[in-house]
From Swiss-Prot:
Gene: tsgA
Name listed for the protein in its UniProt record: Protein TsgA homolog
InterPro entries: MFS, MFS_dom, MFS_trans_sf, MFS_TsgA, MFS_TsgA-like
Record-stated family: Belongs to the major facilitator superfamily. TsgA family.
Gene Ontology, cellular component aspect: plasma membrane
Protein source organism: Enterobacter sp. (strain 638)
Length: 394
């Protein structure tokens, strides 16, 4: 593989994460305007965004098999057609049914693209370099999550219709589409086996189970925590602005943490540093929940920084459980994380209704503790060290 080809594939991975981040995080900014557009209450409007999450979940799950049947380049180019159709559907839709279908299609495109982006990084880079690259790729999710809400705010403040926000997000996919030209993609499935020596099928091992549970609990814990921080802070007497600032501080610190750890991770054993970070994050969340209100900003800043590398490290360790990075394995761990996203309000909603926001934060803290335990147990069964040694000797 030429260096210029590797750079193009890496940028496709970066943009794939940016696309998903933009679609998921911009939801809160546009929901009110969309509800007014369809003359519906915001509460019922929020349910239609489940179609976006469902599309992401289904496509990540199915793409583990699709990757071996449909070439990656074909998938990305067909995704461009679907993206244009979905944005056009949003622009002309005056029925909630067409809006829901368009959201589902956006989710499908986003999930397929992100699973391809994740696989490309795990395929092109080995060992510790893989973890660092995947972490830097994941930072584009947060970066898009910071940029596109600002774009949405500017457009909506000028009374420009909400669907132009999605047209702007579509420009990210235009960049992916352009990069597919003159770019060679890895060949998977039967065609790959004909051109190379047959690869013996590897068993995943019990470590993948621990990592999958960790991925689900981490995302469910993180989103369950950050979704209810504003309500919890307001309950302590904070203003709406101060409560919102806690959330923005968390994501800002999270992004800086990703950049820092993309360099730091190269010098440590991935399972050991993951266990330390999961333990630190659990303690910091406990201190945030039980500490004095004047210290909350510091605790959430440090929590954002030290928890930023956890999810990507889980995915990277998953990919290192086999000698050759398996798209099915990577997608399985990703799917478990996405299930955590889907369950966020299913799990925390009833808890808040019954016991208040504090109980939701304590539940999230318990889930982080489960992540720590899973990472600790993983140390006894992980295969990444023997595969790293093999990779280093080649």
């Amino acid at each position: 593989m030429t260096n210029s080809n590797r750079i193009k594939l890496t940028w496709i991975s970066f943009f794939s994460y940016a696309l998903t981040g933009a679609l998921v995080i911009v939801t809160g900014m546009v929901m009110g305007d969309i509800a007014n557009y369809f003359q519906l209450p915001v509460s019922s409007m929020s349910n239609t965004f489940t179609f976006l999450n469902a599309g992401i979940l289904i496509s990540i799950f199915l793409n583990a098999w699709l990757m071996e049947i449909v070439p990656l380049k074909t998938q990305l180019r067909f995704g461009f057609v679907l993206m244009v159709a979905a944005v056009a559907g949003l622009m002309v839709s005056h029925s909630i049914a067409l809006f829901s279908v368009s959201m589902f299609v956006l989710g499908l495109v986003s999930g397929i693209t992100m699973s391809i982006g994740t696989f490309l990084i795990t395929h092109m880079y080995e060992g510790r370099q893989r973890g660092a690259r995947l972490l830097f790729t994941d930072s584009f999710f947060s970066m898009a999550g910071m940029i596109f809400p600002m774009v949405a705010a500017v457009l909506l403040a000028r009374s420009i219709e909400w669907y132009w926000v999605y047209a702007c997000i579509g420009l990210v996919y235009v960049a992916i589409f352009v990069l597919t030209f003159g770019c060679e993609f890895p060949v998977l499935g039967k065609k790959a086996e004909q051109s190379t020596q047959p690869v013996a099928k590897e068993k995943w091992g019990i470590g993948v189970l621990f990592l999958s549970v960790a991925a689900l609990c981490y995302i469910l814990g993180q989103l369950g925590f950050i979704s209810w921080v504003p309500e919890y802070a307001k309950g302590l007497g904070m203003s709406l602005n101060d409560a919102g600032k806690l959330v923005s501080d968390f994501w800002m610190s999270y992004m800086f943490g990703m950049w820092a750890f993309s360099f730091i991770l190269r010098f440590f054993d991935l399972q050991r540093i993951l266990t330390v970070l999961a333990g630190l994050a659990t303690v910091l969340m406990y201190l945030f929940i039980n500490g004095a209100p004047e210290h909350m900003a510091w605790f959430i800043l440090t929590l954002g920084f030290f928890s930023s590398a956890i999810y990507t490290s889980i995915i990277t360790l998953g990919s290192l459980q086999t000698k050759v990075a398996s798209p099915k394995l990577v997608n399985f761990v990703l799917t478990c994380g996405t299930i955590g996203t889907m369950l966020t309000f299913v799990v925390t909603g009833p808890i808040v209704a019954h016991s208040g926001p504090l109980a939701a934060l304590q539940t999230a803290n318990g889930l982080y503790a489960v992540v720590f335990v899973m990472c600790l147990i993983l140390g006894f069964v992980t295969r990444h060290r023997q595969h790293n040694t093999v990779a280093a000797s080649h």
